Regions:
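Short glycine/Trp-rich loop-beta-loop segment that forms part of the substrate-binding cleft
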Residues: 17-50
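Solvent-exposed, polar/charged alpha-helical surfaces in well-ordered, non-transmembrane soluble domains
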Residues: 15, 25-28, 156, 160-163
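Active-site region of chymotrypsin-like
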Residues: 2-15, 42-137
Length: 173
């Protein structure tokens, strides 16, 4: 248990992931929530880091090769700071998570920046192509079983690669 007053709950509330890239449009209203630290020093991050949230509209959409939405822009806002990467972007109409914040352009102020989020459907399709299962399949799986499979099937090859670059010729354990 990580709680002083008792065990953790069996389940936690969550927002579903939007897997249909055809439901993401310029102008859609979204909620951004993060822990931006762009204007805090190292000591302040430890003591004064607070959640920030704001609403925004999707300003632009981008595709990589598929012709479908892979990345979208939500413009500049209070969340457009370092430390926001990995934070959720939630569709205000459906409550579904559209994607996660991954990049921001540079700018003197947050209003001058352009914040970007990668679409979950793109991540899920990339995972399916690369590792054989979607993001939702991974998230709904058994973490202990996945860890055991990783330890058995992937870890030995990674340790071999690491040992090639270790001064001692030994992989870290």
């Amino acid at each position: 248990s990580l709680r002083k007053d008792g065990p953790l709950p069996d389940t936690f509330p969550y927002h579903s992931l939007e897997q249909d890239r055809g439901r993401i449009f310029i102008g859609d209203s979204v909620l951004l929530a993060s822990y931006p630290a762009g204007f805090l020093g190292s000591i302040a991050v430890q003591k004064d880091l607070y959640q920030t949230s704001t609403t925004a509209n999707i300003k632009d959409i981008f595709t990589f090769q598929s012709g479908l939405v892979d990345l979208f822009s939500v413009g500049g806002n209070a969340v457009a700071q370092k430390g926001s990467s990995g934070s959720a972007v939630v569709d205000l109409n459906t409550g579904r998570v559209l994607g996660i914040i991954v990049t921001s352009s540079n700018g003197e102020t947050t209003a001058e920046r352009d914040l970007h989020a990668i679409v979950f459907a793109h991540m899920s399709e990339s995972m399916k192509k690369d590792v054989g299962f979607t993001l939702e399949e991974f998230l709904s799986g058994d973490p202990s079983a996945e860890a055991a499979l990783f330890q058995k099937n992937v870890s030995p090859a990674l340790l071999q690669i690491l040992s090639q670059y270790s001064p001692s010729g030994q992989a870290p354990r």
